[in-house]
């Protein structure tokens, strides 16, 4: 995107080398995927950074046609840091983001986003099942970090 005397990279053009931490890199990949956007590699990632672009569980969201939405359209409030959406198979994806400079707890009551009952939770970044969730999801999120959970009906 350009204009007179200005150039701005499109939001889905990701240069991982410009981020200060792995937590920021995970957030930079996760947010466009949660919003249903593509991921475009626009730098020369090293072997470590390349792994962020090769997370098959996260890339499966895009292949499914997933498009999530923020819990509330409050750009600066904490509720804008919670994203969710449903996959074609009926499972859900919930993303908890932290824009703060320090670690913070992010929580969402599942019924408030239309999710009812008990679900198996899987952390898509670390490829681990996290047990059963119902009622509320709450997690300590590192500064500029995120947690992306896939919820599958029990």
Per-segment meaning from a language model:
Residues 1-126, 139-152:
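Active-site-proximal substrate-binding groove within the catalytic cores of carbohydrate-active enzymes
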Residues 132-137:
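Short, solvent-exposed S/T- and G/P-enriched segments that are highly enriched in secreted/extracellular
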């Amino acid at each position: 995107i350009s204009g007179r005397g200005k150039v701005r990279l499109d939001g889905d053009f990701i240069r991982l080398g410009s981020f200060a931490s792995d937590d920021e890199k995970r957030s930079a990949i996760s947010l466009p995927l949660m919003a249903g956007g593509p991921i475009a590699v626009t730098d020369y990632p090293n072997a470590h950074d390349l792994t962020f672009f090769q997370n098959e569980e996260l890339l499966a969201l895009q292949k499914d046609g997933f498009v999530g939405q923020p819990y509330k359209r409050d750009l600066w409030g904490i509720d804008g840091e919670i994203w969710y959406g449903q996959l074609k198979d009926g499972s859900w994806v919930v993303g908890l983001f932290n824009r703060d400079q320090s670690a913070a707890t992010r929580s969402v009551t599942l019924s408030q986003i239309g999710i009812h009952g008990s679900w198996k939770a899987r952390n898509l970044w670390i490829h681990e099942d996290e047990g059963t969730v119902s009622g509320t999801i709450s997690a300590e999120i590192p500064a500029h970090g995120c947690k992306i959970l896939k919820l599958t009906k029990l």
